[in-house]
Structures are given as structure tokens and as C-alpha cells.
Amino acid sequence: MPELPEVENVRRTLENLVTGKTIEDVIVTYPKIVKRPDDAEIFKEMLKGEKIENIKRRGKFLLLYVTNYVIVSHLRMEGKFLLHQEDEPIDKHTHVRFLFTDGTELHYKDVRKFGTMHLFKKGEEMNQMPLADLGPEPFDAEMTPQYLQERLQKTNRKIKVVLLDQRLLVGLGNIYVDEVLFRSQIHPEREASSLTVEEIERIYEATVTTLGEAVKRGGSTIRTYINSQGQIGSFQELLNVYGKKGEPCVTCGTILEKTVVGGRGTHYCPICQPRI
């Protein structure tokens, strides 16, 4: 699933491609992707004649701002936005097409069909689901070691499970939580309430630096991720633990292990990340 670095790179490339374009028509071939309104035909009619003004990101969500509305899109596992010419062949996994007045088309492709789209009037999007209960962005002023400390010390849940909770902090998924905990030298099954102030500060620093580096490297292409210009990321070349079960730790040489935490495959070093 695309996490913050991947979604941010989709946002940047997509914004460069479609800002200023006017929607002439919308074709939805898999209506279940459209969650709001509950009728894809209404979704289509509301967007006709709308001009794309800018594209923002909230956590793992893309927000496409048009003249009067906001399209809130979650890519889930395999979702992709790609720009095409009107005479190009249509991929069988293309489920939504935004046809522009200049003859180009924005295609939403999704092999797994897990992605979602919600349409809101401008100004309503942040106060309604799926955005209403999201925590702060990792790079926001609100996100500080003190913010994390206040919340982590109130829960006995395992730290990996807590960091995956988008109500605490947005943007982290399975890949980057494993990397953050390795850099922090924290075992993924530690209870959050057991962490010291110094350990929480390490988590904070690792979160900000890991995500920042990943954004600069275009994200991580583990399987099929590409941005809206069709480019892969390169941060996968810098991953220390994710997907590396059985390989030696880059720090101590110990063989990396994999377990399941909160139903998610989890990679770690048993020496660098001791379970105290």
C-alpha cells in the first residue's frame, strides 16, 4: 500500500500534469470505487465542467480540488493515476476516467479494486470521514516528541500497532514503521507505555528523517508502485529491515527476523531491537 512518501510523490507529479485542466466528462466502469455520493452517475454529473485547481495530500489520501468540490482518493493497495491521450488504448484495470477538454484523460487504474473516492463540497472534507479522525502530519508543528509522549504513555498496545494507527499520526504504513523502529532501536512488540522519554524522542526523529528521505527518493517501489509520470521510487534501495528476513543486519550482522504484530508481517533485528 502506498504510504506517505509514495502518495506525496503521486501528488507532486499529478499536480504538474493536470492543474488547470477542465473536466468535460467522467466515465466510471467500476462504481463501487465511488463511495460518496453513493451513485456514480451523480458523481459524474457533479464533476462535469469543474476545473482542477490544485492537489493536496492528507496522510495517505489524495485531495483533488476542483472549482466547487474536492475528490478525496485513497489508492489502497494498487491504485494509480496516470495521464493519457484520448486515442490511447484503455487498460482493462482502468475503472475511472476523467476526460478533459484539451483531449487528455486522467485514468484511475486499480488491479485490486480496493481504492476509494469521496466527493465533498469545498470546506466540508476535513470534518467528515474518512478525513475527520486523522492525526497530525509528521512534518506539522503539532507533531513533537511531547505530542508522542503524551499519547504513547497512555496505551499498552504494541508500539508497531500504535504507529500504524492513523488517528495518532498519519502516513506511516507497514514499510516505514519497520524502518522507523529499526532506526530507533525499538522492538516492534514493546508496549508503548513502557517507552522512555529518550526512546520516544528517537522514534520522533526516525519518523521525520525516514519519511523525509523517502519523499526525496520518490518513495519505495516494492512491487508495482509508480508515480503519475510512470516513474518508480528508489528508497527501497535504502531499506534496512523491511522485506529482508534472513539477511544480515546492516549494523551488527545478526540475521534479521520476521514475526507478525497486529496481523502485519514485521521485520526486525533481535540484537539491535531487544525485547526488554
UniProtKB/Swiss-Prot annotation:
Binds 1 zinc ion per subunit. DNA binds at H93, R112. The active site is at P2 (schiff-base intermediate with dna), E3 (proton donor), K60 (proton donor), R264 (proton donor). The keyword Cytoplasm does not apply. It catalyses: Hydrolysis of DNA containing ring-opened 7-methylguanine residues, releasing 2,6-diamino-4-hydroxy-5-(N-methyl)formamidopyrimidine; 2'-deoxyribonucleotide-(2'-deoxyribose 5'-phosphate)-2'-deoxyribonucleotide-DNA = a 3'-end 2'-deoxyribonucleotide-(2,3-dehydro-2,3-deoxyribose 5'-phosphate)-DNA + a 5'-end 5'-phospho-2'-deoxyribonucleoside-DNA + H(+). GO terms for biological process: base-excision repair. InterPro entries: DNA_glyclase/AP_lyase_DNA-bd (IPR015886), DNA_glyclase_Znf_dom_DNA_BS (IPR015887), Formamido-pyr_DNA_Glyclase (IPR020629), FPG_cat (IPR012319), MutM-like_N-ter (IPR035937), Ribosomal_uS13-like_H2TH (IPR010979), Znf_DNA_glyclase/AP_lyase (IPR000214), Znf_FPG/IleRS (IPR010663). Its EC number is 3.2.2.23, 4.2.99.18. One of its GO terms (molecular function) is damaged DNA binding. A zinc finger (FPG-type) spans 240-274. SUPFAM superfamilies: Glucocorticoid receptor-like (DNA-binding domain), N-terminal domain of MutM-like DNA repair proteins, S13-like H2TH domain. Involved in base excision repair of DNA damaged by oxidation or by mutagenic agents. Acts as a DNA glycosylase that recognizes and removes damaged bases. Has a preference for oxidized purines, such as 7,8-dihydro-8-oxoguanine (8-oxoG). Has AP (apurinic/apyrimidinic) lyase activity and introduces nicks in the DNA strand. Cleaves the DNA backbone by beta-delta elimination to generate a single-strand break at the site of the removed base with both 3'- and 5'-phosphates. HAMAP family: Fapy_DNA_glycosyl (MF_00103). Belongs to the FPG family. Monomer. This is Formamidopyrimidine-DNA glycosylase. It comes from Bacillus cereus (strain ATCC 14579 / DSM 31 / CCUG 7414 / JCM 2152 / NBRC 15305 / NCIMB 9373 / NCTC 2599 / NRRL B-3711).
